[in-house]
From Swiss-Prot:
Entry's free-text remark on domains: Has a two-domain beta-structure, folded into four very similar Greek key motifs.
Name by which UniProt lists this protein: Gamma-crystallin E
Keyword list, A-Z: Eye lens protein, Repeat
Any single biological process term in GO: eye development
Tissue note: Detected in the superior olivary complex of the auditory hindbrain.
Taxonomic lineage from the root: Eukaryota, Metazoa, Chordata, Craniata, Vertebrata
Molecular function terms, GO-annotated: structural constituent of eye lens
Amino acid sequence: MGKITFYEDRGFQGRHYECSTDHSNLQPYFSRCNSVRVDSGCWMLYEQPNFAGCQYFLRRGDYPDYQQWMGFSDSVRSCRLIPHSSSHRIKIYEREDYRGQMVEITDDCSHLQDRFHFSDFHSFHVMEGYWVLYEMPNYRGRQYLLRPGEYRRYHDWGAMNARVGSLRRIMDFY
């Protein structure tokens, strides 16, 4: 079980709300979010209700202001607790609908283009585990949660384009 606390003001000040499960709409509990404390679990925060908009991956720790989680604003409107997974396996494809070159990955990759020699990745099949996909190399840029399942095109994971720079397993739990 996870635990996360959202604070309206920086430095863990102001009105706060404790959460231990997925929430599709946090708007009734606070109007803005400027700091977060993750006591346990790994979480994905979303700028919009219903798990939409920019996504931010947080693990156990203190985040005294939204820049600490690479946020663009103080808007956090939904959150998802990421379940524990002991094994990780993902297939990545060069083209939509699982076409083109395919590579299977079981570990983190800080620079997908250097490792696999193609720059865009249009589809994914997550066989096992939960992953964070980053728009840029070295785990930077926009973040996307990939849960077990099929992602036939970049819109399926919430991206605006097929630019993918790095991929990391979610392993740090409780």
